C-alpha cells in the first residue's frame, strides 16, 4: 500500500506520543489498551515519573489513570515538536511507529461503559443527555441502555465525535497516510506481547506488560443482540473496511442484563 501523507498530517495526529531516546512514535487510540501501552513505552523510554503519579491521585483519578498525565508518562507530545522534527518522526526510517486496534463492537461497549454508564469525568453533557439509562423495576438494564446508545450514535455520529472515545479508529490512526511498523490487534492472542518484545529489544529493557483500567467484566454476549451489533458495525464501517475485522455473529433477537440491587447501589 502507498502512504500519501497530507501536509496537515502532523496536525491530525498531534496527540501522538514520542519517545525520543528509543525513537518510537505511538499514536494512542482510546479504549484500545492505551493505558497499558503508554506505561510500557514510558517505562522503556525511562521517562515514567512515579512521584508525579502519587501527587495527582484524587477521588476522580485512580493510580492507573495517572498514566494519561504528561507529567507522569514523561513522553514528548508530537504537537510540542517543531514542524521539521514532526515530519522526521512521521517519515524517517530510523523511527518505529506503533498503534493498536480493537474489535469495533468491544471498543464501542467499553467506551460507552466508561464514559456514559459510569459517567467518567469529562464526558460531554450533550452525550449523556442523548443516552439516558433504561430501568427495569428501578434497576438499570445494561443491555437495553447500551442499545439506546447504539441507536443514538448510529443516528447522529457527528454529535458523538466531540468525544474521541466514540470516533472510528480510522479517524485516529489515519492509516492511509502514516506507515506503521507495528499495528497490533489487541484481541488477537500474543500481539500485545509481540509489541512489548519489539519495544524492549529496541530500548534494551525488560519492561513487563501491565493490564490497566479493566472494566466491569461484562461479556459481549451479555449485551449484544443482532440489532445492536448491526447498528455498531454500521456506525464504525470504516474500521471494518480498512482493518479487516471479522463481522460479528450475534443472532439473538433481544437481550437483557438488569443489575442486581448491590450492583445498582454501587453504580
Name what the model sees in each region.
Residues 1-267:
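Membrane-interface amphipathic segments in extracytoplasmic regions
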Amino acid at each position: 500500500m502507498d502512504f500519501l501523507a497530507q501536509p496537515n498530517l502532523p496536525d491530525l495526529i498531534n496527540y501522538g506520543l514520542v519517545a525520543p531516546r528509543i525513537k518510537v512514535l505511538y499514536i494512542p487510540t482510546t479504549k484500545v489498551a492505551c493505558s497499558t501501552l503508554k506505561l510500557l513505552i514510558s517505562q522503556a523510554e525511562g521517562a515514567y515519573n512515579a512521584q508525579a503519579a502519587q501527587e495527582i491521585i484524587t477521588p476522580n483519578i485512580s493510580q492507573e489513570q495517572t498514566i494519561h498525565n504528561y507529567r507522569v508518562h514523561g513522553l514528548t507530545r508530537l504537537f510540542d515538536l517543531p514542524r521539521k522534527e514532526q515530519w522526521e518522526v512521521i517519515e524517517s526510517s530510523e523511527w518505529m511507529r506503533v498503534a493498536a486496534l480493537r474489535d469495533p463492537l468491544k471498543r464501542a461497549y467499553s467506551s460507552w461503559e466508561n464514559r456514559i454508564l459510569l459517567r467518567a469525568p469529562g464526558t460531554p453533557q450533550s452525550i449523556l443527555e442523548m443516552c439516558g439509562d433504561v430501568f427495569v423495576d428501578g434497576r438499570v438494564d445494561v443491555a437495553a441502555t447500551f442499545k439506546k446508545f447504539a441507536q443514538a450514535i448510529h443516528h447522529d455520529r457527528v454529535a458523538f465525535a466531540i468525544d474521541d472515545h466514540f470516533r472510528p479508529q480510522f479517524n485516529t490512526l489515519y492509516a492511509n497516510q502514516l506507515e506503521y511498523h507495528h499495528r497490533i490487534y489487541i484481541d488477537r492472542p500474543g500481539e500485545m506481547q509481540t509489541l512489548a518484545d519489539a519495544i524492549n529489544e529496541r530500548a534494551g529493557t525488560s519492561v513487563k506488560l501491565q493490564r490497566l483500567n479493566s472494566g466491569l467484566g461484562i461479556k459481549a454476549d451479555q449485551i449484544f443482540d443482532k440489532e445492536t451489533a448491526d447498528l455498531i458495525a454500521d456506525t464504525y464501517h470504516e474500521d471494518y473496511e480498512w482493518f479487516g475485522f471479522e463481522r460479528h455473529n450475534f443472532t439473538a433477537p433481544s437481550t437483557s442484563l438488569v443489575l442486581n440491587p448491590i450492583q445498582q447501589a454501587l453504580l
